[in-house]
């Protein structure tokens, strides 16, 4: 399940592109998530009222939250699988406070891949996509493992 050094390098190379515009990437990821999986919007009291894509694009709060999500994920990816210290508090809040099911983590992972394909096609070929999929799968597996320890069957 682990990634090779080369795979981590592919992940971090494309992540460097994300970091050039974290709020823009984060906003696009969340809009794709909410449009593609409207049920996920119910977990976000702050965004439930946003019904159209235009309303979502105009929301500074959504942009800020997108930046928060991708900043946290970037911190995890940079640990190259040695991310237990970063995962534990994230799993704790997502299991006990926000009650975000693992399925929703799968949904947002798909959206991240789609945004990277759309925004960075030249830097996100098949090898990079495969590596990012593996990195996001590792993240989800470790979140799920922590959820289980916390007694959350999300």
Curated annotation (Swiss-Prot):
This is Myoglobin. GO terms for biological process: brown fat cell differentiation; enucleate erythrocyte differentiation; heart development; oxygen transport; removal of superoxide radicals; response to hypoxia. The modification Phosphothreonine is found at residue 68. Monomeric heme protein which primary function is to store oxygen and facilitate its diffusion within muscle tissues. Reversibly binds oxygen through a pentacoordinated heme iron and enables its timely and efficient release as needed during periods of heightened demand. Depending on the oxidative conditions of tissues and cells, and in addition to its ability to bind oxygen, it also has a nitrite reductase activity whereby it regulates the production of bioactive nitric oxide. Belongs to the globin family. Nitrite binds at residue 65. It holds the Pfam family Globin. Heme b binds at residue 94. It catalyses: Fe(III)-heme b-[protein] + nitric oxide + H2O = Fe(II)-heme b-[protein] + nitrite + 2 H(+); H2O2 + AH2 = A + 2 H2O. CDD domains: Mb. Keywords: Cytoplasm, Disease variant, Heme, Iron, Metal-binding, Muscle protein, Oxidoreductase, Oxygen transport, Phosphoprotein, Transport. The modification Phosphoserine is found at residue 4. GO terms for cellular component: cytosol; extracellular exosome; sarcoplasm. Monomeric. Residues 2-148 form the Globin domain. It is found in: Cytoplasm, Sarcoplasm. It is linked to Myopathy, sarcoplasmic body: An autosomal dominant, slowly progressive muscle disorder manifesting in adulthood with proximal and axial weakness that progresses to involve distal muscles. Patients may lose ambulation after a long disease course, and some individuals develop respiratory or cardiac symptoms. Muscle pathology features include sarcoplasmic bodies in skeletal and cardiac muscles. O2 binds at residue 65. It comes from Homo sapiens. Its EC number is 1.7.-.-, 1.11.1.-. Transmembrane segments: none annotated.
């Amino acid at each position: 399940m682990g990634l090779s050094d080369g795979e981590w390098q592919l992940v971090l190379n494309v992540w460097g592109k994300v970091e050039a515009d974290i709020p823009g990437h984060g906003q696009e990821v969340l809009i794709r998530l909410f449009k593609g999986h409207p049920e996920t919007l119910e977990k976000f009291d702050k965004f439930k009222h946003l019904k159209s894509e235009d309303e979502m694009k105009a929301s500074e709060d959504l942009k800020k939250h997108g930046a928060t999500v991708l900043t946290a994920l970037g911190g995890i990816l940079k640990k190259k699988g040695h991310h237990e210290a970063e995962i534990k508090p994230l799993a704790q809040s997502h299991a006990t406070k926000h009650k975000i099911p693992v399925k929703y983590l799968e949904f947002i992972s798909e959206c991240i891949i789609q945004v990277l394909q759309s925004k960075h096609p030249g830097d996100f070929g098949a090898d990079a996509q495969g590596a990012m999929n593996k990195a996001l799968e590792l993240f989800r597996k470790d979140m799920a493992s922590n959820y289980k320890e916390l007694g959350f069957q999300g």
